[in-house]
A protein has these predicted regions:
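Short amphipathic alpha-helix that is part of the acyltransferase structural core
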Residues: 1-27, 128, 134-172
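Acyl-donor-binding surface of acyltransferase catalytic domains
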Residues: 41-42, 48-148, 269-271
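Conserved hydrophobic beta-strand within the GNAT/NAT acetyltransferase core sheet
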Residues: 207, 240-244
Length: 275
């Protein structure tokens, strides 16, 4: 395992990952975060350098980490299952309860196999596809039929966001607070200043947790918020993406109409201790 630290190496890797889109989109987003300010203390490792076949961008809790309250997350890009297996069994990767993996669906079995060998089981959430917008020219804004104001979330809104997630708990509260505190987000507020629609971004530059309260739907709020965030990200020279479940026909239609194209199937894996 080689951990890339030098700016020239990370910049070179960025150019290589661009050539591997759409398969590399999440790792590329994490690399962009590292090159910007790396608030989330991400690391980038590869199987070899200056050429590589597998790259893992990850946040690993260590002594002195500012984000110990957030589950460790690993985003994987690989063109070779043998090199992927080698990286995942490297001693520098500390397998423990709560690890999260984001990986192309056809690589998920390797993660499950190694987790089992290490005495863990894996909870799987699959069936997601990346939807990517590569340039401002391909960005189509949906019509907004509301006069409500646009604003940004603050940490006091974290519980409101988590209430609308299909999963929750203290881990998600901490994660959402960190996203709101450190990363771009947008929301629409009602006449009293309360958020009624919002979109967040994560450390891999993925649009996440989009939600609109029922009485405010069908007014173009989420589309408008996504458009604003996408413009910002693309202006930074980065393709913008989100992950949508294959059964979410409404979101797929919305993103397709906005100029996003479908990428690869993604599976999320959560490592759990046995027993």
């Amino acid at each position: 395992m080689i951990i890339l630290k030098a700016f020239k190496d990370l910049t070179r890797m960025k150019n290589i990952l661009y050539q591997e889109l759409p398969h590399s989109i999440s790792v590329l987003g994490g690399l962009h975060h590292i090159l910007q300010n790396n608030v989330f203390q991400l690391k980038m490792c590869v199987d070899s350098w200056p050429t590589f076949s597998t790259a893992i961008c990850y946040h690993q809790n260590q002594i002195g980490s500012n984000f110990k309250e957030i589950n460790e997350k690993y985003s994987i890009f690989s063109k070779n299952q043998n090199s992927l297996r080698s990286l995942l069994t490297d001693d520098k990767l500390k397998w423990r309860d709560g690890l999260e993996f984001e990986v192309a669906n056809h690589h998920s079995q390797i993660v499950r196999e190694i987790a089992s060998l290490r005495g863990f089981h894996v909870e799987e959430d699959g069936g997601y596809y990346s939807y990517i917008n590569y340039s401002p020219e391909k960005l189509i804004m949906s019509e907004k039929t509301s006069t409500l104001a646009t604003s940004t979330l603050n940490e006091s809104h974290a519980e409101l966001v988590v209430q609308q997630l299909p999963y929750g708990g203290s881990d998600e509260i901490n994660r959402v607070k960190a996203y709101i505190r450190h990363l771009p987000n947008r929301c629409v507020v009602d006449e009293k200043g309360h958020p009624v629609s919002w979109v967040l971004t994560d450390e891999f530059h993925c649009l996440r947790m989009a939600y609109t309260q029922p009485k405010y739907r069908r007014k173009g709020h989420v589309g408008h918020l996504r458009f604003t965030l996408v413009q910002q990200k693309i202006s930074e020279g980065l393709p913008v993406f989100c992950q949508i479940h294959k059964d979410n026909a409404a979101s797929i239609s919305m993103m397709s109409k906005a100029g996003f194209t479908r990428g690869v199937e993604t599976t999320y894996l959560m490592v759990k201790a046995e027993g």
